[in-house]
From Swiss-Prot:
SUPFAM superfamilies the record matches: Class II aaRS and biotin synthetases, Nucleic acid-binding proteins
Membrane-spanning intervals of the chain: none
InterPro entries for this protein: Aa-tRNA-synt_II (IPR004364), aa-tRNA-synth_II (IPR006195), aa-tRNA-synth_II/BPL/LPL (IPR045864), Asn-tRNA-ligase (IPR004522), Asp/Asn-tRNA-synth_IIb (IPR002312), NA-bd_OB-fold (IPR012340), NA-bd_OB_tRNA (IPR004365)
Chief site of localization: cytoplasm
Gene: asnS
Name this protein carries in UniProt: Asparagine--tRNA ligase
Disulfide bonds: none
EC number(s) given by UniProt: 6.1.1.22
Family statement: Belongs to the class-II aminoacyl-tRNA synthetase family.
Reactions catalysed according to its record: tRNA(Asn) + L-asparagine + ATP = L-asparaginyl-tRNA(Asn) + AMP + diphosphate + H(+)
Region forming the signal peptide: none
Subcellular location: Cytoplasm
Length: 434
């Protein structure tokens, strides 16, 4: 029986061996009485040589007409050839056309197409080599996170997506009818993770989060994947240490396993290699001083948006923290700084090269009365948070957590010009199809 192989397995060591290969036509070039088909699968590309005197007139004519993304199965002999991709090619003896394609809607070089065309045909675009590489890197970053979390004693939990209240502000909730009442799509699993720490102490989850923000920036999606951690007995400084160790492992492990894919997007890997903890830390006050010294029109108490973060990232060649934010610009659940009631014990991790925030974290408010007051100050209904307040009634402890935006991390690692390319099917205010 002829052995079925993947493209990445066609190497000079198989010289003289008969193999069977299934995939899609990437390019089709005729030179005299030979046709050179580049066939791709999920692992790479192989050159298949179709010679008229071997396959016959009928098969040769079929091969001539195969357009890009035609699906085929070929059988043939592996021949070592340093000119071929991977140093070997397949000399075809049999060609089976599963489906012939005459014209593919996406150019051979997708970068020549407009972003709108690529997004309209996203269901086809994701099969192109660079789009596939992005998904492989994303998958590997998550795999690396799981490795580190398992090794460090964290428990994975599975929180709900349908919720009754806001975590990050009511204005950004997606509302939907839930039988005879209303529910919302989750903005974050955080509150449910906080409940889980009283039994499991260190927990994490990977879920989609939804934000009804009409932000049209290169780093916002309305649906994104959220890697969130929560731990009992940790303060802000403890959880920042967890963040940097986790991110460092994710990036280094992905560099180890996906260097080829990363090099499709980055010529220089220095910045990614430079992720050994500890990461630099600056206070919000210091960040304001840096921005003002660079002529940015910002005052103490202002939130730091994409433009301000971009300026700050110019000061660092690796991820770094900004901590100690003003209370009024942060979420209700963050613990007040006991040394300065104007601030909360919160931090953001910013990626260099202009990418900005990839993680938001904080120590959580563990005092019942203070948390209730913050809920009321935000104009929210305490009834929606009765169960959450219960966590402060029965054995409350100091605890902290954070959320990592997976697509933001992918965008930085691969130096993408827009976060939408890090999502399989991106959701933005302007796009819900396909």
């Amino acid at each position: 029986m002829i052995e079925k192989v993947y493209c990445q397995e066609v190497k000079p060591e198989l010289d003289g061996k008969k193999v069977r290969l299934a995939g899609w036509v990437y390019t089709n070039m005729r030179v005299g009485k030979k046709i050179f088909l580049w066939i791709r699968d999920s692992t790479g590309i192989v050159q298949a040589v179709v010679a008229k005197n071997v396959v016959g007139e009928e098969t040769f004519e079929k091969a001539k007409k195969l357009g890009r993304e035609s699906s085929v199965i070929v059988e043939g002999i592996v021949k070592a050839d340093e000119r071929a991709p991977g140093g070997a090619e397949v000399h075809v003896e049999k060609l089976e056309v599963i489906q012939a394609v005459s014209e593919f809607p996406i150019p051979e070089n997708p970068e020549q197409a407009s972003p709108e065309l690529l997004l309209d045909y996203r269901h086809l675009h994701i099969r192109t080599p660079k789009a596939s590489a992005i998904m492989k890197v994303k998958e590997t970053l998550i795999m690396a996170a799981r490795e580190w979390l398992l090794k460090d004693g964290w428990h994975e939990v599975f929180p709900p997506i349908l919720v009754t209240g806001a975590v990050e502000g009511g204005a950004t909730l997606f509302k939907l009818k839930y039988f005879d009442k209303y529910a919302y799509l989750s903005q974050s699993a955080q509150l449910y993770l906080e409940a889980a720490i009283f039994g499991l102490e260190k927990v994490w989850s990977l879920t989609p989060s939804f934000r009804a923000e009409k932000s049209r920036t290169r780093r916002h999606l309305t649906e994104f994947w959220h890697l969130e951690l929560e731990a009992a007995w940790m303060d802000l400084w403890d959880i920042m240490k967890v963040e940097e160790e986790l991110v460092s492992y994710m990036v280094q492990r992905t560099l180890e396993l996906r260097k080829k894919e990363i090099e499709m997007f980055r010529d220089d890997l220095t910045t990614l290699k430079n992720t050994e903890p500890p990461f630099p830390r600056i206070s919000y006050d210091e960040a304001i001083d840096i921005l003002q010294s660079k002529g940015v029109n910002v005052e103490w108490g202002d939130d730091l948006g994409a433009d301000e973060e971009r300026v700050l990232t110019e000061e660092f060649d690796r991820p770094f923290f900004v901590y100690g934010y003003p209370k009024h610009i942060k979420a209700f659940y963050m613990k007040e700084d006991p040394n300065d009631p104007r601030k909360v014990l919160a931090s953001d991790m910013l990626a260099p090269e202009g990418y900005g925030e990839i993680i938001g974290g904080s120590q959580r408010e563990d005092d019942y009365d203070k948390l209730l007051n913050r809920i009321l100050e935000e104009g929210m209904d305490p009834k929606d948070y009765e169960w959450y307040l219960d966590l402060r009634r029965y054995g409350s402890v100091p605890h902290s957590g954070f959320g990592l935006g997976v697509e933001r991390l992918v965008a930085w690692v691969l130096k993408l010009d827009h976060i939408r390319w890090a999502a399989l099917f991106p959701r933005t205010p302007a796009r819900l199809y396909p």
